Amino acid sequence: MPIRTDRLVLRLFTPDDVDGMYAYQGLASVARYLYRPPRSREQCARLITRIADATRWERKGDALVLAVRRHDAPEIVGEVILTLDNAGAAQAEIGWVLHPAYEGRGYATEAARALAAVAFDRLGVHRLFARLDVENAGSIRVCERLGMRREAHLVENDRYDGRWGSEYVYAALAHELRH
């Protein structure tokens, strides 16, 4: 099941990945864009237990969460997520979370591009979208590099820690991103 790109391997999480996930999920700088507090190591362990074998793709909320690592190193650099939003309309949400130490190297774009190909070519997704904080410049660049268009600006649609957040919605149709 692993997905290989030029530089990365995308694979299901295993119990051995708890510390790797916690290394980025435990950071406030990462969690702020997810509108939630940083995760504890124990929360990461529970999450991995839940998602490690979650490969069902039938109803709203079913998700494929893959660990991302480089070919040349065993540590996890982040994760990519594909969540079924509407089975009847073949729509899914794509997302990514990267350890800040690995930002700016194109890993998020490379991993998201590979997961988008799986969504369109293997899972039959027609429309893929991403929701991201308007201040998340890195994720905005990833969406643009993928060829997604900005479809919406949701103003103060979420609130975390007493602060309102706004989101952009980017999307693309299968025929627009297939090469």
Region spans (language model):
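Acyl-donor (CoA/ACP) binding surface of acyl/acetyltransferases
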Residues: 1-32, 49, 65-179
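Active-site rim helix/loop that mediates acceptor-substrate recognition in acyltransferases
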Residues: 37-62, 67
